[in-house]
Amino acid sequence: MSSSKTISIIGGGCAGYSLLNKLKNVSNIEIDFFIGKNEGINNFWGYWEYDKDIPDNILSGKWNKWKISTQDGEKFFESSSHPYCVTTRHNWISYCKQNTNKKNIRILKEDIIEINNKIYNKNNDEIISDFIFDSRYKNKSKNIFLQHFKGFLIKTETDCFDD
């Protein structure tokens, strides 16, 4: 019999819930999920599909073709095996909550602070786990690349887009 590992996930946004969703079938783990108190705005969560078990009904869009446009031109891409998917934050978190085994997971609505590379809860108790994953955004480098999309949601009365 193998011993259980402890995992702490910090950050209750889409990235934290994505990790929780990935860990749902792992045995012999105990998870403390620190989601914080901030519910966040209902923005969009985009990802490349690798898991076919995520239902299309939670998606806002799914594309097998896309292009990247820069000042220097455009580059077209296509992937039938790993389409780009977009859902809303609320749909994604709701899906992850419904499809996660709760018996080994503690969801904690408390903020976490970091002092001298150590992580503490609201009672100033140090968070100690075998693995700690912090999905909160930290702007530590000017050279960090963040993927953001600026655009509009367009709805038409007739289907005119080549999904």
How should each PLM-predicted stretch be described?
Residues 1-4, 25, 53, 60-62, ...:
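Flexible, charged surface loops at secondary-structure boundaries
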Residues 2-32:
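N-terminal Rossmann-like FAD-binding beta1-loop-alpha1 element of flavoenzymes
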Residues 15, 39, 138:
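Conserved Rossmann-like nucleotide-cofactor binding loop
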Residues 19-20, 43, 142-144:
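Short glycine-/acidic-enriched loop or helix-start segments at secondary-structure transitions
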Residues 22-73, 150, 154:
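N-terminal FAD cofactor-binding segment of flavoenzymes
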Residues 22-26, 99, 135:
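Active-site catalytic microenvironments for nucleophilic, acid-base chemistry
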Residues 49-110, 116-118:
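A conserved beta-strand/loop capping segment in the N-terminal third of enzymes
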Residues 103-163:
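Predominantly flavin-linked oxidoreductase catalytic cores and closely associated redox partners
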